[in-house]
Amino acid sequence: MWHLKLFAVLMICLLLLAQVDGSPIPQQSSAKRRPRRMTPFWRAVSLRPIGASCRDDSECITRLCRKRRCSLSVAQE
């Protein structure tokens, strides 16, 4: 008879352990998190080639963004 009681207690413990293990992770604060900044290594690796679209000089491998394109020369027509 004590085998059944021990088995029942073990099953209840396993059930409770599974409930705790499967519980949802609490939500973190709803404040917007600031995205990580790129390190200098990744900034250099991710530079765009000549002719690629760009927003500013820092995105181009030549450091010249003209008319939203990476350029080779300053005065390109």
Swiss-Prot record:
Residues 23-37 form a propeptide. Disulfide bonds join 54-65, 60-70. Gene3D superfamilies: 4.10.40.50. InterPro entries: LEAP-2 (IPR009955). The keyword Secreted applies. Residues 1-22 form the signal peptide. Keywords: Antibiotic, Antimicrobial, Cleavage on pair of basic residues, Disulfide bond, Secreted, Signal. It is found in: Secreted. Has an antimicrobial activity. This is Liver-expressed antimicrobial peptide 2.
